[in-house]
Amino acid sequence: TLDGNQCFNNIDLSVLNDIITINNLNINSPIELGSQNWSNGRLTRFDVGNFFNGGNITLNTLPQSIGNLSDLRILYMWYNNFITLPDEMTNLQNLIYLVLSFNQLISLPENIGNMSSLIWLDMGYNNLQSMPESIGNLQNMSYLWIFNNQLSYLPNSICNLNINWDGIDSNFLPYFGSGGNQLCDELPSCIATSENIETSIDPLYYSFLITVCNDCLLMDLNRDGIINVVDIIAVINIILDENNEPTDTQVCTADTNEDTAINVVDIIAIVNTIIDN
């Protein structure tokens, strides 16, 4: 989707072209790759992989230039064939959501801790054998999914994360899940005592849940990966439009307190979120 600005940043277009070239894809234009959201000429959301929103294509590798997508907020690259990720990916310091489940990953970049804005990191259903020590630097992390890998060891630094190790959210999603691994001895204390240490999600149910999350991000009404005054205006317009009922997506994104009504309370919640950030 576009925000009305028909200009595309050449750096971002170059990255998309690099992805097409390195994977030998038969795609004529970079803006036809997967699903994309652009804001002020920059790519803010990118979905690509063997799923509907991803264009039903399979990537095998990523170019080093992926780290140049400096405004990217949301990246869904599940259902691909990645074995490793380029170190340059850790330059994506504005990235909030990173979903790389259902790949073949055996490791993560050592400097993943540089991705300081990450809230959601999903590495489920890969072949990960270890986690980098720097994982503990991700102080904004709320969700960490590492289930169904080949992990036998986790660094103690993981306990630096501000995660509710035992909890589930309002959609019954666990904040943490590490089931389906080989985690037995000498575990970090936060993991050893976690009620979610054996938590995993069945692939069929998992796919449904993530699709819902993919399409509905609370307070982000224009789905650009940023919560700002544009979203406040969108809520006001919904409230003022007395002739039409809000769509399911509008309710999902704008009803911040989940009381099934969109009103001034939701506007205040968005304003407070912007101020806090």
What are these model-derived regions, one by one?
Residues C213-N277:
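Cellulosome-associated attachment modules in secreted, modular CAZymes
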Residues L62-G67, L85-E88, L108-N111, M131-S134, ...:
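The feature encodes a structural signal of leucine-rich repeats
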Residues I57, N80, L100-N103, N126, ...:
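Consensus "Asn ladder" position of solenoid repeat domains
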Residues T1-T61, F172-Y175, G179-M219, R223-D224:
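N-terminal capping/linker segments that flank leucine-rich repeat
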Residues L59-Q64, N68, Y76, N80:
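Glycine-rich active-site/cofactor-binding loop and its immediate structural neighborhood
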Residues S65, E88, N111, S134, ...:
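Tandem-repeat architecture and repeat-register "anchor" residues
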Residues N40-G41, N68-D71, T90-L95, G113-L118, ...:
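Leucine-rich repeat
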Residues T44-G49, L75-M77, L95-L100, I119-M123, ...:
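Conserved hydrophobic beta-strand positions in leucine-rich repeat
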